[in-house]
């Protein structure tokens, strides 16, 4: 099946102008949900969807869906859906999300121009706030579409300035009505950049994801005693940061040891808030954010328990008080069998031997998989770079992956 790589590139490069930033290397953009660059990106997408003959709707949380109903197909037949997101992280790259959205549109165009006779509608979907940079933890639009979060709760979410999602979407003209319901889809398939270098190292343009790792976030607090850095002897200190540093190293050790049996395991303390955070003051309090991931939930639990044990030991040995809360928890998400096998067959049909792989990053597909059969494809990321202007996927790889997506969508819809 033929796809138009030049048209795909044009759409992605046009989207890259919305929120474009100056970068010493590469191309970057900042398009947070509900901002003017996000509005321009959404408006361009709607124009392109309508130009391809898709009927566009926007739901209450700003999810955009363009639906193509082939001749002779009942409009209410469960659709095959495909897409991704258009929001970005601050100073992010131009492929993360937009590749999946515009590859989805190009896949529909390819099916429209082929001799394939789909028995189902095909929907191109752009989810709201995948990145979680302004509202909530991320994967917001897909969590609502999957029924994991209510429209009302999502609209009440506010950014650091107190602006709610409801207000932000209204201001850019994308506060629609109703709820996009993923349970009404027969299947879902997403194309995304890999955000790692495994495909590049293997020289393969397409990866078929088997499982998306689970994610646990834990909020950790260590409280000691604030004191004068010069006047307080070393023997008399209850240094919260020194105690927290032991915890960070213990988490690293626990995760490294876990990889001997599970090479998908990772553990990261990625956020520290030190109080009072002054050079001449012994730290009295440290707040930390712990991120644990694996394709095996038992491994995640084991690392979390090692973290708890570390904190208990530190409490005893360092005369500090501690707190630990497992605040966010998503189990590993296996892709459905047919949404793994169909793209694998599509790869073979176009002469590509795909790489089977897991995803260490979260994607909207995680939530959609709770509502219908779901699959995820990867395209290579140069040097594994992402969430940065250095993020890059060669245009030839974009086209090859889009061709596989088109073949997959065609097969799922017939």
Q: In which residue ranges do the predicted regions lie?
A:
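A non-catalytic alpha/beta surface segment that caps or lines the substrate-entry region
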Residues: 23-69
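A short beta-alpha structural unit
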Residues: 30-33, 268-277, 289-291, 321-340, ...
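His/Asp/Glu-rich mid-to-C-terminal helical/loop segments that flank catalytic regions of hydrolases
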Residues: 228, 237-258, 307-309, 379-414
């Amino acid at each position: 099946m033929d796809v138009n790589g030049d048209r795909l590139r044009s759409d992605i490069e046009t989207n890259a102008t919305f929120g474009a930033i100056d970068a010493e290397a590469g191309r970057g953009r900042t398009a947070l949900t509900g901002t003017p660059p996000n509005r321009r990106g959404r408006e361009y997408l709607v124009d392109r969807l309508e130009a391809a003959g898709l009927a566009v709707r926007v739901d209450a949380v700003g999810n955009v869906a363009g639906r193509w109903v082939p001749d002779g197909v009942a409009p209410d037949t469960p659709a095959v859906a495909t897409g991704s997101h258009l929001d970005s992280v601050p100073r992010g790259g131009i492929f993360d999300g937009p590749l999946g959205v515009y590859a989805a549109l190009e896949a529909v165009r390819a099916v429209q121009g082929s001799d394939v006779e789909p028995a189902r509608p095909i929907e191109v979907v752009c989810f709201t706030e995948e990145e979680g940079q302004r509202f909530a933890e991320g994967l917001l639009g897909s969590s609502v579409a999957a029924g994991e979060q209510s429209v009302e709760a999502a609209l009440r979410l506010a950014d650091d300035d107190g602006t709610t999602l409801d207000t932000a979407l209204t201001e850019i003209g994308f506060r629609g009505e109703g709820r996009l319901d993923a349970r009404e889809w027969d299947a879902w398939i997403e194309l995304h950049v890999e955000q790692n270098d495994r495909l590049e190292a293997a020289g393969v343009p397409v990866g078929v994801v088997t499982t998306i790792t689970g994610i646990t976030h834990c909020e950790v607090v260590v409280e000691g005693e604030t004191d004068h850095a010069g006047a307080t002897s070393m023997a008399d200190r209850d240094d919260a940061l020194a105690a927290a540093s032991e915890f960070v190293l213990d988490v690293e050790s626990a995760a490294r040891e876990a990889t001997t049996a599970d090479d998908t395991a990772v553990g990261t303390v990625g956020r520290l808030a030190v109080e009072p955070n002054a050079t001449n003051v012994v730290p009295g309090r440290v707040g930390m954010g712990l991120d644990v991931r694996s394709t095996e939930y038992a491994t995640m639990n084991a690392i979390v328990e090692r973290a708890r044990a570390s904190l208990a030991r530190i409490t005893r040995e360092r005369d500090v008080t501690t707190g630990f809360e497992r605040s966010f928890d998503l189990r590993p998400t296996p892709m459905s069998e047919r949404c793994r096998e169909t793209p694998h067959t599509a790869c073979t049909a176009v002469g590509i031997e795909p790489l089977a792989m897991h995803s260490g990053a979260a994607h909207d597909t995680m939530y959609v998989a709770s509502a219908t059969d779901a699959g995820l494809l990867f395209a290579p990321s140069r040097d594994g770079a992402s969430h940065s202007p250095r993020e890059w996927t060669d245009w030839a790889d974009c086209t090859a992956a889009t061709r596989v997506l088109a073949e997959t969508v065609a097969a799922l819809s017939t």
